A protein has these predicted regions:
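Hydrophobic residues at beta-strand termini and immediately following loops
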Residues: 92, 158, 203, 289, ...
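Conserved core of the PLP fold type I
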Residues: 121-255, 265-267, 272-284, 354, ...
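N-terminal basic, amphipathic alpha-helical segments
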Residues: 1-114, 118-123, 127, 134-136, ...
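Short glycine-rich anion-binding loops that position phosphate/pyrophosphate groups of nucleotides
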Residues: 97, 229-233, 294, 426
Length: 444
């Protein structure tokens, strides 16, 4: 085991056992390297690995700290609340669509029809790659909405975004491969990547999206690049056309794989939705990942991949080892929902409501003195923060407001602090004013 990994393992154990408390400041790499008798880069690599895994956070010149969101192991079993267990969304809670706007009665009718007309064959195990009807409906949807020309055989249904990433890594990754990860970027995907013995390679994001030149200069031999080109999570910027061509050229030249997470692409409030990077994929190096969690509802637990034709056999083999876990009834109901035009009408309605709800919360936050970062789409927003945004988020969380600190989404990159929040379940203007006032009070 490399020395830096041994140091990282010892640090992780100390955090798990409570010897290093959440928020504790670690010695500088210079100081600790002298004490351990190793090079400074060895300590830096150990710190970087734990930052990538979420155990540590960097706060610029202030140093490296144990994450506030890490809790030591307890000697007794405790009941804990997991994300998604609360039936009532918390104010500003991210990752949820507008649950009040979903057409539940329509969905029930479509599903009821499927129940009434199903045959004995519908009670058997479904296709390991997902039901043909749903894959065909997704092909039609992607052709019209995202400019992607593919065949049903290229589509694989999974039970969520994490399952999609796991399927990709099972099919294509080898131990020791590296993956470009947007910095800042979605933190909960990092443990899934490292669990497959793939190294996280943080690449900074600027106003034009992922800095492809930085990625090539620092990690030219990466095997994967995981990106959100349509609406970067969490900054909301789009990958420029020049950089789209640049990353495709790099992937073709390096025989690397681009995983396109088409996050929030359906919700753009100024201009038409951008076409997917996959629509430009002449070299066939892009694996497209989508989900219905934000457009419909998270309990559906249904996502999909579009893989290159030459990789179908590899993915089908892996899918046979861990078959699609989305119930056949739900898949067929969703196929009908798409094919009959209900999904399109629902998206149109949601865009209108989200534009209104975003306007309400922007105005309310501005009235309370907050500065909202402009974004062209998505279902979340960033407000700029001066000072320790992690401490600000902790205060807001204690007041029952589910904001997140932008710094918790960073790995190595530095930048201004901020709070991340969603507006999807702000149901009226009065509620927007109320929660904005609560946030101001919590941070005062």
């Amino acid at each position: 085991m490399p020395r830096y990994q041994d140091i990282a393992r010892q640090l992780k154990t100390a955090i798990e056992q409570g010897e290093l408390k959440p928020g504790a400041r670690l010695p500088s790499s210079r100081t600790w390297s002298q004490e351990l008798g190793v090079s400074r880069s060895t300590v830096e690599n150990a710190y970087a690995e734990l930052v990538a895994q979420g155990w540590l956070i960097r706060r610029g010149q202030a140093g490296t700290f144990v994450s506030e969101r890490i809790y030591p192991q307890q000697s007794t079993v405790q009941v804990v609340a997991f994300a998604g267990e609360s039936q009532q969304p918390l104010p500003f809670q991210m990752g949820l669509p507008a649950l009040d706007l979903f057409p539940r009665e329509l969905w029930a009718r479509v599903m009821g029809r499927r129940l009434r007309t199903q045959t004995r064959f519908d009670l058997a195990l479904g296709d390991v790659c997902g039901e043909a009807a749903l894959r065909e409906a997704i092909v039609d949807y992607l052709r019209v909405s995202r400019g992607i020309d593919c065949q049903p055989e290229q589509v694989f249904i999974t039970h969520g975004y994490a399952a999609s990433i796991a399927l990709i890594l099972h099919a294509l990754a080898k131990p020791g491969n590296g993956m470009w990860i947007e910095d800042p970027g979605f933190p909960l995907i990092r443990p899934i990547v490292t669990r497959h013995d793939v190294e996280i390679l943080p690449v900074p994001v600027d106003d034009n999206g992922l800095d492809i030149t930085s990625g090539i200069q620092n990690y030219p031999d990466a095997r994967f690049a995981l990106i959100t080109p349509a609406h970067q999570s969490p900054l909301g910027v789009a990958l420029s056309l020049a950089r789209r061509h640049q990353i495709l050229e790099w992937a073709d030249r390096s025989q690397a794989w681009i995983i396109e997470d088409d996050y929030d692409s359906e919700f753009r409030y100024h201009g038409k939705p951008l076409l997917a990077l996959k629509s430009l994929d002449a070299p066939q190096r892009v694996i497209y990942a989508g989900t219905f969690s934000k457009a419909l509802f998270p309990a559906l637990r249904c996502a999909w991949l579009v893989v290159p034709v030459k990789q179908i056999a590899q993915f089908r083999h892996q899918a046979s080892l861990a078959p699609c876990a989305v119930p056949v009834l739900w898949q067929n109901t969703l196929a009908d929902f798409l094919r009959e035009g209900h999904f399109w009408r629902h998206l149109k309605k949601m865009r209108q409501h989200y534009a209104q709800r975003r306007q309400w919360i922007e105005q309310a936050l501005t009235q309370q003195g907050f500065q909202v970062v402009p974004q062209k789409g998505g279902i979340q927003m960033v407000i700029r923060m001066i000072g320790d945004d992690i401490a600000h988020a902790r205060k807001a969380n204690a007041a029952g407001l589910a904001v997140q600190a932008l710094s918790d989404w960073r790995i190595r990159s530095s930048g201004e602090g901020g709070l991340l929040l969603s507006f999807t379940n702000i149901v009226n203007e009065g509620m927007a004013r109320q929660v904005a006032q609560q946030l101001r009070k919590a941070l005062s």
